[in-house]
UniProtKB/Swiss-Prot annotation:
The keyword Ribonucleoprotein is assigned to this record: yes
Native source organism of the sequence: Lactuca sativa (Garden lettuce)
Lineage of the organism: Eukaryota, Viridiplantae, Streptophyta, Embryophyta, Tracheophyta
Keyword Ribonucleoprotein on entry: yes
GO biological process, any: translation
Chief location: plastid
Entries under InterPro entries matching the protein: Ribosomal_uS4, Ribosomal_uS4_bac-type, Ribosomal_uS4_CS, Ribosomal_uS4_N, S4_RNA-bd, S4_RNA-bd_sf
Function statement: One of the primary rRNA binding proteins, it binds directly to 16S rRNA where it nucleates assembly of the body of the 30S subunit.
PROSITE patterns reported for this sequence: RIBOSOMAL_S4, S4
Keywords, in A-Z order: Chloroplast, Plastid, Ribonucleoprotein, Ribosomal protein, RNA-binding, rRNA-binding
NCBIfam families registered for this protein in UniProt: PRK05327.1 (NF003717), rpsD_bact (TIGR01017)
Protein name: Small ribosomal subunit protein uS4c
Name of a matching Pfam family: Ribosomal_S4
Region annotation Disordered: where it falls in the sequence: 15-44
Amino acid sequence: MSRYRGPRFKKIRRLGALPGLTNKRPRAGSDLRNQSRSGKKSQYRIRLEEKQKLRFHYGLTERQLLKYVRIAGKAKGSTGQVLLQLLEMRLDNILFRLGMAPTIPGARQLVNHRHILVNGRIVDIPSYRCKPRDTIAARDEQKSKVLIQNSLDSSPHEELPNHLTLQPFQYKGLVNQIIDSKWVGLKINELLVVEYYSRQT
């Protein structure tokens, strides 16, 4: 299944706020109206919606998300927590969380168009897994800096997660450590996502 490119507001009206997909918010009470219209949700639908929430927020294809779930399942620790860490440490998501891109699709475009350096080298793979002590910066070109400055100027200036440091005047961010789960930028029950996939096999 390909990456979603359809109407974004339609998704947030059904699934709730998805800040990685769009900075728009559903109108207050719209989720309650949808719920009353559709009646009581089945357990399958609840798990499906949590999976969709994760997929659309991080801008993943179905195949990509399944791959991350399998990697997380083989790692030590809680599969759900490891899954969120893997997704949060993607380069496109790090750029978004730093405020250097307005959304994750916007961050992906910056990376694809070779505007971004990791540790001084161009990285054009949005799924690149960032590590502690990585430095993420704009290329030393006017166009790259303008794109990032525009995003920094329009970002909502929310509190930065403690695993990241932003140096806005240098168009640069630092990864201090692996993300703590309490700083994940999405209201999600990751265990339901893991359950969804475990029941598909």
